[in-house]
């Protein structure tokens, strides 16, 4: 069939769109703003024939540009007509010079093609599609499609000059149709003139003769096979052409074949950009757009699995009704396929496509390229009319069997040129999958549910002071401030302050004291003139008044805090006094406790005689003061006397926690009365009998941290229990405060969780807020010697003060209680997956390591770490990850771990099972850290759900077992 006298042959090189794994990934309507990738035009040949009446074949015209309503349309009777070819057709009739010229012409335009946005498509076109022909029955619609005519036979354009360049300037629109959609689509086949009303037999012959023949790069064929196929192709061409015709229309052009890399640029974009660009996607299109970027054959237990059954497109509604024999249909030979009715041929192709799509990684696609056409219908329409002429038609069928050669697959012949990183990833996946098939899933040994603790008995864990070294003589130094007379320090005696007389420093390196001479306050004299007066004198005058009602206390506090008279709220204090306390308790409060508190507060210049340094960031400094001095400072905090500590934002102390108790007095929270009970218990105790001990506050800032990947230290011992508490059962150990970076958190406001509770029952911790700047990532605060004054029950809203507590812990040589508390602040994670990011895990490791490390102290002199679910709860941390991080940090610091799960018996068993699993296999800190990194890379980095499918501990079990099995297998092969 020639082009006819009315049309001079023109040369045209159609291009194939970038292949993706999703059938709809190349749909121009659904996924705009895509860039196409093309390869060497030598990769494939294609043959086209153009009907004589085609308007695109007018002499002097290169073809219709995008948007033309008269683009070329190919005739196609059935989907199986594309599968009737036997073997692979090749014809190299062009000379070497012609090929070089063509390649140069094609390659010159490849860069411009890549720069264009391939899917520059307006979403509105989806709404302007042609209306469906709904008046026909489903049978007529299906038959009409399957028996449709091709309105333009495929031929080669043979015009020279700039025809090809002009055609390539207009970017073709691309729509991908999968086989199940072919069975439902009803393409308008209106002929251009009567010359195209051929019979069905002629259509079949034309379809077989003028099919697009693609030179497939992966076909490993000899030169003789190629020559034989070339001869066969020429023979077919001579049969179909007139004897006098030069067969020029049967010559083949080379086109660009895009390798079907599973991780190509377009494929990787489809998942993320498809739903965003088209909010009006149909059900089927949305499903296609969300298909995985790559597919692989792997075991379900693999941590790198992609569940294609959830992401890939499922059967359409029409197919679901006609697929009861889905798994029983097989492809026959090409002759059997040709003899089947076209409807069953389409169904066979559909079934084979879906079967292979779910099990194979290779891909072949049916891919249509359109040039022109003003409207496109949805991909899931039963009858889709495509107005205009289709100028190029490329068909790519995913996972269909080779249609010409029995028992061969078309994917065996398609070129695949994956990127280097794709190849590495596929190699790793293959290795991982093979390993996984051999390794049974590890199941931790069964643990009795009756066990209340697991691991090393707590009696064997080291405690202070028995494990500690003898302390040196207490004396002040450049990095240690001591506020008492060390030469007069005696057990059971109240330490004497040092120096004897008050020394004042009003600068940015020390706490600004209420009794400072620089603490001035504007006052009015008898003449009404304002002058600067001593605020300390005003404080003394206000507090020395008797308090019989809560209103009296409120007025006294506001007298020297006039600026906050309309801002501060005393509702909680008033309700506590009037509604919570009984009459006798209220009377004891205002007759005894409050006057004693005023007395110790106003004795501040005589008790705290030395300026208190600020523990700023990057400082390694300690402050040792007496419990009496702390009591005086806390009494001043209760009466809100500390200057410059109430302003917010960019004030002088904005990087320090609140110290004045004004926020404790506000609101109607049910927590406030219990907090006030706990604090008044402390003040009653210290005013009735002066405490005799010392307390040391140490800010520790580290610069050098372990290289966690290379840390070869083994894991230390573990005791884990769901009973008990850190403060009760961790006596003599390093007790972890799950701190806020502003130490104390909400202790002076509404907070009432682990840190706030600890600061309430050990109120001497609260004074650290006076001089401790916000903690940096490499810093911690260590407090040694605080005393517990109260017992409690509950937690948060259920917290209740129970009774006064007599602390029976021993004292060291510095007269400090052997209670060492370390405040380490965890990160706050709003997204669960964020905590598995390597930088975040490293930060948490460094923070815990900073709190656990004691430079210069050997491991046998270090007590065990008593800790629990640090950074969990409101901070969003995963308890199992945090437990592992603390175990690693303690091992690096050479400390044992006593872990309290606070009633969670399942967590207790999980932590113990993981610890025993790692220690039995002699894994080091670095080994476990690498597993954490691997978990992030394989499970969390590309996770699109709130949490990974595989949890951390099962992943570690499997990874370690897989590695051990691989090592054993390698040893057996090498004979070692």
Curated annotation (Swiss-Prot):
Modified residues (Phosphothreonine): 139, 199
Positions carrying N6-acetyllysine: 340
Tissues/organs with expression: Ubiquitously expressed.
Effect the entry attributes to changing residue 756 to N: Reduces hydrolase activity
Sequence positions bearing Phosphoserine: 22, 68, 133, 137, 197, 261, 264, 286, 291, 298, 302, 316, 448
Endpoints of the signal sequence: none
Biased composition (Polar residues): 332-342
Record's keyword annotation contains Transferase: no
Active site (UniProt): 737, 755, 756
Motif (PIP-box (PCNA interacting peptide)): 76-83
One Gene Ontology term, aspect cellular component: cytosol
Entry remark concerning the domains of this protein: The PIP-box mediates interaction with PCNA and localization to replication foci.
Assembly and interaction partners: Interacts with PCNA. Interacts with NUDT5.
Name listed for the protein in its UniProt record: Poly(ADP-ribose) glycohydrolase
UniProt organism field: Homo sapiens
Lineage summary: Eukaryota, Metazoa, Chordata, Craniata, Vertebrata
